[in-house]
């Protein structure tokens, strides 16, 4: 395939053509989503069993083989069971086509919103990068084609790819997440000059494809559809309803500026490695009869080489991964993996190489996700400078877990000379486990009224003593600990289930 050579030689500045299959004459039929040809956006229709998903997979792979990941990247949205997305990203093995910038395979509202925020963030980032490039180059306007030319010429140093957003079976997306679909179409329209291409695939266009989608779809590919009306909707002719064979399709661009009948290429066939020319010793074993005729020949090496090595698709992806790794090529991921449901303090500390400072009580309580800035980081609470803290949450939301993490993270990093906890657990009494910790003065429960009264008398006395002690240090606890030769511990009064305490 010589893909790295192809990546070096092929540039999407003037054309983004990629083989899709063959036409009626047996010539290679190419789809070119450059805005001067068939692009930037389009529709694909085909009933179940028509070969629609295979055509999409073939097109993605064709682009990936021919264009550098810095020139072309993909977001795959797949609700048909994840077949298209899984073809290019195996989350179990970690293998992923180098060109993949993100995949969505379920209709979880939170995940949809997260992805949409990330896509919008990417558009804003591209606008900033293009504005910077305009100032550097002196160009009056910058679009994706001009920017990529500047990058190829070394004027700018950050690659920006054509971003293909491909949605297989968007009818379900539109039905269950209509706002997301509307935002996606709007994003594609706004992002046209920024290198965004939207390809929507459906089984039946009628009632699903609205005027906004039609008006923004320059090319249309129609495989076998169930009814003539569907074919008429797509390509203004009933011919697609009479298609007999899987993978056959009609391609229409604009108002019949280009019209062709073709057969999609197929990349799911078995991959059989071809022999490479080399000098070899003949190890063939021949069986002959009594008069010297060969009755049977066995060549173990040849038979071993002719054995199938899986699908062509997976082998080509493995090859492209290898090429990208050798050249240290990485595509910018538009969103990170979602934060897992269960995380441990120790794992977060290790993951982010977090180190606690002496006398800075800044316990780890979790990890935060910021899709707008395509960022995840460790989440801490600064008890020295943050003032008081209120934790809200319904039953079962994780309040106890948060308090537990806060205490645990604090006492594993700070001794009793730095911090003292006084805990009033009027809830499940889960915080009882900290009773014997040296940093914990006491853990008080709901029926221990006298202990509660004594605690607040003690706290009031400590406040009065510290007011005098800190007088020469601007009345500030942190300033005292920084400038004085003595240190005072931070006092943390924690009330779990404040409603019960208040009553």
Give the residues covered by each predicted segment.
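P-loop NTPase catalytic phosphate-binding loop
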Residues: 4-141, 154-229, 233, 241-242, ...
């Amino acid at each position: 395939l010589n893909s790295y050579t192809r990546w070096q030689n092929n540039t999407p500045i003037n054309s983004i053509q990629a083989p899709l299959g063959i036409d009626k004459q047996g010539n290679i039929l190419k789809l070119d989503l450059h805005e001067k040809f068939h692009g930037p956006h389009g529709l694909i229709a085909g009933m179940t069993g028509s070969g629609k998903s295979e055509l999409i997979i073939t097109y993605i792979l064709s682009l990936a083989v021919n264009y550098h990941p810095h020139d072309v990247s993909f977001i795959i949205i797949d609700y048909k069971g994840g077949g298209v997305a899984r073809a290019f990203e195996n989350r179990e093995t970690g293998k992923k086509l180098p060109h993949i910038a993100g995949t969505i395979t379920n209709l979880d509202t939170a995940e949809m919103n997260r992805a949409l925020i990330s896509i919008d963030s990417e558009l804003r980032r591209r606008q900033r990068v293009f504005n910077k490039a305009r100032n550097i180059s002196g160009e009056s306007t910058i679009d994706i084609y001009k920017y990529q030319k500047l990058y190829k010429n070394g004027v700018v140093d950050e690659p920006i790819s054509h971003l293909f957003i491909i949605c297989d079976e968007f009818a379900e997306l539109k039905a269950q997440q209509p706002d997301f679909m509307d935002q996606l179409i709007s994003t594609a329209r706004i992002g046209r000059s920024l290198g965004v291409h939207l390809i929507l695939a459906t089984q039946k266009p009628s009632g699903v494809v609205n005027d906004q989608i039609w008006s923004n779809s320059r090319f249309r590919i129609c495989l076998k559809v169930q009814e003539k009306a569907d074919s008429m909707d797509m390509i203004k002719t009933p011919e697609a309803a009479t298609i007999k064979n899987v993978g056959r399709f009609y391609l229409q661009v604009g108002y019949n500026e280009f019209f062709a009948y073709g057969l999609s290429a197929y990349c799911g066939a078995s991959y059989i490695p071809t022999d490479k020319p080399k000098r070899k010793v003949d190890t063939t074993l021949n069986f002959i009869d009594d008069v010297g005729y060969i009755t049977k020949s066995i060549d173990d090496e040849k038979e071993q080489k002719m054995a199938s090595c899986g699908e062509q698709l997976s082998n080509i992806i493995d090859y492209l991964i290898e090429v990208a790794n050798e050249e240290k090529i990485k595509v910018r991921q538009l969103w990170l993996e979602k934060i897992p449901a269960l995380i441990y303090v120790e794992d977060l500390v290790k993951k982010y190489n977090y180190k606690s400072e002496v006398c800075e009580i800044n316990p780890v309580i979790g990890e935060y996700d910021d899709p707008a800035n395509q960022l995840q980081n460790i989440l801490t609470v600064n008890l020295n400078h943050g003032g008081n803290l209120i934790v809200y949450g319904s039953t079962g939301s994780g309040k106890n877990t948060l308090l537990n993490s806060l205490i645990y993270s604090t006492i594993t990093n700070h001794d009793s000379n730095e911090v003292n906890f006084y805990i009033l657990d009027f809830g499940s009494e889960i915080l009882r486990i900290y009773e014997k910790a040296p940093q914990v003065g006491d853990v008080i429960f709901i029926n221990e009224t006298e202990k509660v009264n004594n605690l607040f008398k003690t706290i009031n006395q400590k406040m009065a003593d510290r007011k005098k002690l800190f007088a020469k240090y601007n009345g500030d606890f942190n300033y005292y600990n920084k400038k004085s030769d003595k240190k005072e511990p931070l006092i943390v009064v924690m009330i779990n289930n404040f409603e019960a305490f208040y009553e």
